[in-house]
C-alpha cells in the first residue's frame, strides 16, 4: 500500500529574487528607540536585497515605518513654536519637496490650502535633519528637501480611522494637484522615514 504524502507548507516555487522586508515590533506596543535601532539593523542586513548602481553608494531607496512618537514630536514642535496637542489629535506628513524655493513654497502653500478645504487645521512645518555625506553622487543630485507637516484633528472628527480617512483624502487631493512633491506618509498613527 502506498502512503499518501502530506502537503508541506514550503513550496520551492515560491522562491524568487525580490526586495527584502523585515519587521520589528514591541508586543506590548511600547515605543522605544531600541525598536528604531533594530529596524535600521534590518535595513543594513538586507542591503544585498536592494538595487545599487555601479558606484556602489546609490541605492534604490529604503524606508522604515514607525508608530508616531508623540513625546518626540511634542518636544520638537514646541521648539518650533506650535502645539500639536495630545497623542492621536494630530497627523504627521513626510514630504519630499523640490529644492527650488519657489516650487517648494508653492507646494507647501497648496497643501495648507487643501488641508483647510478638507476641514482640517494646518499647524506647521518642520525641516527634517539629514546627513547627505553618506549618499552617492547620483542620490545627492536627486535628494529632495525633506519636511514634515503637522495637521490638527477637528473636534467633530473621531480619533483613529475617521481622522486618518480625512488625512488620506487631503493627501490624495494634494498628490493629484501637485506633481513635484512626493508624500511618503500622512497619518495620525504611523510615519515613514526614507
Regions found by a protein language model. Name each.
Residues 1-194:
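N-terminal segments that mediate ammonia production and transfer
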Amino acid at each position: 500500500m502506498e502512503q499518501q504524502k502530506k502537503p508541506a507548507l514550503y513550496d520551492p516555487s515560491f522562491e524568487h529574487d525580490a526586495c527584502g522586508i523585515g519587521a520589528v515590533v514591541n508586543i506590548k506596543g511600547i515605543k522605544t528607540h531600541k525598536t528604531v535601532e533594530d529596524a535600521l539593523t534590518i535595513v543594513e542586513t538586507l542591503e544585498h536585497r536592494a538595487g545599487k548602481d555601479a558606484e556602489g553608494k546609490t541605492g534604490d531607496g529604503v524606508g522604515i515605518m514607525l508608530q508616531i512618537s508623540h513625546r518626540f514630536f511634542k518636544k520638537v514642535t514646541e521648539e518650533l513654536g506650535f502645539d500639536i496637542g495630545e497623542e492621536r489629535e494630530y497627523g504627521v506628513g513626510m514630504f519630499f519637496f523640490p529644492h527650488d524655493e519657489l516650487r517648494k513654497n508653492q507646494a507647501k502653500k497648496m497643501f495648507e490650502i487643501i488641508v483647510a478645504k478638507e476641514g482640517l487645521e494646518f499647524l506647521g512645518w518642520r525641516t527634517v535633519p539629514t546627513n547627505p555625506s553618506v549618499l552617492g553622487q547620483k542620490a545627492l543630485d536627486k535628494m529632495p528637501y525633506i519636511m514634515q507637516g503637522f495637521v490638527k484633528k477637528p473636534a467633530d472628527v473621531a480619533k483613529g480611522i475617521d481622522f486618518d480617512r480625512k488625512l488620506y483624502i487631503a493627501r490624495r487631493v494634494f498628490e493629484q494637484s501637485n506633481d513635484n512633491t512626493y508624500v511618503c506618509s500622512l497619518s495620525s498613527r504611523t510615519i515613514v522615514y526614507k
